[in-house]
């Protein structure tokens, strides 16, 4: 039995050892491949040199100094030699007593932290000053096993490269000490109104006391806490308690004497109550501020710096920043956007309207931007151009629907979709248009021009949600939501409302829309937009060292030349097309302009993203807290035109690239196929449209949707109100006259051949569409002509009065079908009608009752003699 138990224990022990070895091997491999490569942190920089922004002079091509940077944050940097010894000693005593001996890690305290972790307790604590600085320096302060392991190896690597004095100097310059203070020199001035070198031992201990928890131990903390005795304590009382602990620790470690300790404890701490509320010396314009932000973000991403370190590098690290700004463009942007009268709108709740603009050139340079409307009065205010994410509405359609569908070969500009509700949603027809009308069958080109929502949804359904989603992210690099839980509901951007109508879960930034649309005038190439080309600094050997480089941005081909041509051609029509086009107010005299408007269902966000061969600009308009915008027209188009018309002054007009292989073809607007004669005879007018397509996209078939039918123009079709429907008549019956027939009294034919649509639409929610009246099924239902219901009977010719004859007036000549004058010849007077004599009333004879016989015979009247030389009148030849 004992032997058996021994074998079991031995086996378990062996398994445990093997498992441990395996885990150690895995851990070693993980540390070697994952942790160590990320362990190095570069911190060799100076913080006492002015950084300068340069811009390129377009006339010379040389970079010109634009701006020297000065930080406006509450911050004073000091060298190690200027830090009081009491401050250094107090810091080491309370934070890391073995600082001068260890190599970055206190293994005893680290092991204690591991034990706490395995017992399910908080694993915080145990960090050395080196480790604390690395957390402050990098901004990585999440408490996880991986982060702790990485912190350990980073600290070991850090102490191999930097001295203890450097580490302590950086630590004391970067620690947060409450009230917006970073660093001990800043805290000295803020809390005591003194230079750091003037602090007493007691004041040094007071400042270092804050590091443990600024919210609790900050002298100005307004947090009120109850101590173990049930007493409510203030921030200053807690700071005093912590200060005395620091002083006691220094005495306990033999750093200060008993006398120094007692004197410091007894010293009254006199805090200043003054608050520095002065305005910053320099208010940066929107472009400079965005540039500073971009450089800071790239420093943090590329070097792992915290935001605090990155900020110090930008403002006082001696950087040379080469900006992409076009000073002329930026000055125009500022002049328009600083003047609120250019867009004077106020919401029902009293909010002033806001707007932002970003302008990008063909090289991907952001040449101008404004982050808000009105005078800029502060630094680091809210920037609507790069920080706000708002729903783009219909401005998303070229990116999410039409470009990917064209690229997939699913549609051409001539393809036809129904501008008619797709379904009933919530008891109403969906989707609605703005305005809330439907047009029926439309080409893709027309759908984009008038911003048809149903057509966009139908194209998206053909394309597929995932294909659209992936195309937006992969080709246009716009972040979409894959899945976000909101109040127990999972929301994402895989749907018609999001991708076809622009109701994105998280919205989109103005800068992202400008970047995405710049692909179109750039012949399908995506280039990430940038505010700078390079950031450099002067190295110790005097050379200019590049630390951030944006010069080698490789263009990414994301659209074919065919797709970009089609999009450009259709979006030009949005601006110049008329007849429902939504962007006509963006026209610039003498310049090619294309673009797309956007508005949300509730009209809380308005967009226009437009471009020329020179620049692409995205404009958003809305309120800080979304409210309905009441304005005539689209205010985003208004702001776009106000800026871009000035930007393009003096520039020569040119068009976008036109590839080879294009042909012009006559297309039916209702079927998208080659036009037939029936398409010309549509009662609404010709439905034939001339379109330019690539040869491979020209339809081979002729329109079969239009069918020819005969109607009678004497019998108009009436609507429900009794009004004649324009151009629509009942089908011709057998008795409707095809031509004039005077023998039947018919002066002209009333039968006409028209082209009608042989198309069936399933009604949704009882919604009608104007083109539905011109469907064959509708006309068939109206029946045949209700005027000519019986065969016409012959009509006798009207009598001719020869007394009306006037040889000089052809209208008085005898009718050709009058047999009495069948020989009539205008040149032969013998054939002319002879006026019938009028009866002369006789004298009235009295009635005497007697009959009398005349006694004489009346003499004959003399015949008038013929006048010599007279001839009969012969009219001129007709």
Segments predicted by a language model, with ranges:
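Short, well-structured active-site flanking segments
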Residues: 100-109, 182-185, 257-262, 406-425, ...
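Conserved catalytic neighborhood of penicillin-recognizing serine enzymes
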Residues: 116-143, 212, 277-281, 410-468, ...
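N-terminal type II signal-anchor transmembrane helix
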Residues: 1-56, 118
């Amino acid at each position: 039995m004992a032997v058996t138990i021994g074998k079991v224990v031995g086996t378990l022990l062996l398994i445990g050892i093997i498992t441990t070895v395996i885990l150690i091997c895995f851990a070693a491999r993980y540390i070697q491949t994952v942790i160590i490569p990320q362990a190095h942190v570069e911190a060799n920089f100076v913080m006492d040199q002015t950084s300068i922004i340069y811009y390129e002079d377009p006339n010379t091509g040389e970079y010109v100094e634009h701006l020297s940077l000065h930080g406006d944050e509450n911050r004073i940097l000091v060298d190690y030699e200027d830090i009081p010894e009491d401050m250094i000693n107090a810091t080491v005593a309370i934070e890391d007593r073995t600082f001068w001996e260890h190599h970055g890690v206190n293994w005893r305290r680290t092991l204690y932290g591991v034990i706490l972790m395995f017992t399910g307790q908080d694993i915080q604590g145990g960090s050395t000053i080196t480790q604390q600085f690395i957390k402050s320096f990098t901004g990585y302060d999440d408490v996880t096993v991986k982060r702790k392991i990485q912190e350990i190896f980073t600290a070991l690597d850090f102490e191999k490269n930097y001295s203890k004095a450097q580490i302590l100097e950086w630590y004391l310059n970067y620690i947060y000490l409450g009230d917006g203070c970073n660093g001990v020199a800043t805290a000295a001035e803020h809390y005591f109104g003194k230079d750091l070198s003037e602090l007493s031992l007691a004041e040094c201990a007071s400042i270092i006391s804050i590091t443990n928890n600024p919210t609790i131990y900050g002298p100005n903390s307004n947090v009120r806490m109850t101590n173990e005795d049930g007493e409510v304590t203030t921030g200053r009382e807690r700071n005093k308690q912590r200060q005395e602990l620091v002083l006691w620790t220094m005495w306990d470690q033999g750093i200060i004497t008993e006398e120094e300790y007692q004197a410091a404890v007894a010293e009254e701490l006199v805090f200043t109550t003054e608050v520095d509320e002065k305005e910053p010396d320099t208010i940066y314009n929107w472009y400079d501020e965005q540039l500073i932000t971009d450089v800071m973000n790239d420093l943090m991403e590329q070097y792992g710096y915290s935001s605090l370190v990155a900020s110090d590098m930008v403002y006082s690290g001696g950087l040379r920043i080469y900006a992409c700004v076009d000073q002329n463009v930026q000055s125009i942007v500022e002049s328009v956007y600083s003047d609120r009268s250019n867009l004077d709108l106020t919401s029902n709740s009293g909010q002033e309207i806001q707007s932002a603009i970003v302008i990008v050139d063909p090289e991907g340079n952001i040449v101008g931007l404004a982050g808000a409307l009105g005078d800029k009065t502060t630094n680091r205010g809210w920037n609507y151009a790069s920080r706000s994410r708002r729903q783009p509405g219909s401005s998303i359609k070229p990116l999410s629907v039409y470009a990917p569908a064209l690229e997939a070969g699913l549609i051409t500009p001539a393809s036809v979709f129904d501008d008619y509700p797709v379904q009933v949603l919530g008891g109403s027809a969906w989707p609605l248009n703005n305005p809330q009308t439907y047009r029926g069958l439309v080409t893709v080109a027309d759908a984009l021009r008038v911003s048809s929502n149903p057509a966009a949804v139908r194209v998206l359904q053909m394309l597929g949600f995932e294909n659209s989603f992936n195309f937006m992210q992969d080709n246009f690099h716009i972040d979409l939501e894959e899945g976000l839980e909101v109040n127990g509901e999972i929301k994402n951007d895989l749907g018609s409302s999001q991708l076809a109508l622009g109701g994105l879960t998280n919205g989109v930034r103005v800068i992202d829309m400008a970047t995405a649309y710049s692909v179109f005038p750039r012949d399908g190439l995506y280039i990430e937009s940038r505010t700078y080309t390079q950031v450099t600094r002067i190295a110790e050997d005097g050379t200019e060292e590049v630390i951030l480089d944006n010069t080698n941005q490789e263009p990414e081909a994301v659209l074919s030349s065919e797709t970009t041509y089609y999009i450009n051609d259709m979006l030009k029509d949005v601006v110049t097309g008329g007849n429902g086009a939504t962007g006509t107010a963006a026209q610039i005299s003498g310049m090619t302009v294309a673009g797309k408007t956007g508005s949300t269902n509730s009209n809380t966000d308005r967009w226009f993203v437009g471009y020329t061969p020179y620049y692409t600009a995205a404009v958003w308009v809305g309120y800080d807290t979304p409210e309905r915008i009441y304005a005539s027209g689209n205010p985003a188009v208004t702001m776009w035109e106000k800026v871009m018309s000035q930007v393009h002054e003096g520039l020569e007009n040119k068009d976008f690239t036109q590839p080879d292989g294009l042909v012009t073809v006559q297309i039916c607007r209702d079927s998208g196929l080659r036009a037939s004669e029936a398409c010309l005879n549509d009662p609404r007018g010709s439905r034939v449209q001339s379109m330019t397509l690539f040869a491979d996209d020209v339809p081979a078939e002729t329109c079969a949707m239009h069918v020819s039918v005969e109607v009678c123009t004497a019998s108009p079709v009436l609507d429900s109100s009794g009004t004649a429907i324009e151009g629509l008549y009942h089908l011709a019956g057998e008795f409707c006259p095809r031509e004039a027939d005077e023998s039947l009294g018919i002066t002209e034919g009333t039968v006409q051949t028209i082209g009608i649509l042989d198309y069936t639409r399933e009604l949704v929610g009882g919604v009608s569409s104007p083109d539905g009246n011109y469907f064959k099924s509708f006309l068939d239902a109206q029946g045949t002509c209700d005027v000519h219901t019986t065969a016409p009977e012959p009509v006798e010719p009207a009598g001719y009065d020869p007394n009306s004859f006037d040889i000089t007036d052809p209208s008085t000549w005898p009718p050709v079908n009058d047999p009495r004058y069948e020989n009539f010849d205008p040149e032969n007077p013998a054939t002319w009608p002879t006026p019938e004599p009028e009866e002369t009333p006789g004298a009235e004879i009295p009635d005497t009752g007697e009959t009398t016989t005349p006694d004489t015979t009346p003499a004959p009247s003399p015949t008038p003699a013929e006048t010599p030389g007279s001839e009969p009148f012969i009219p001129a030849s007709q």
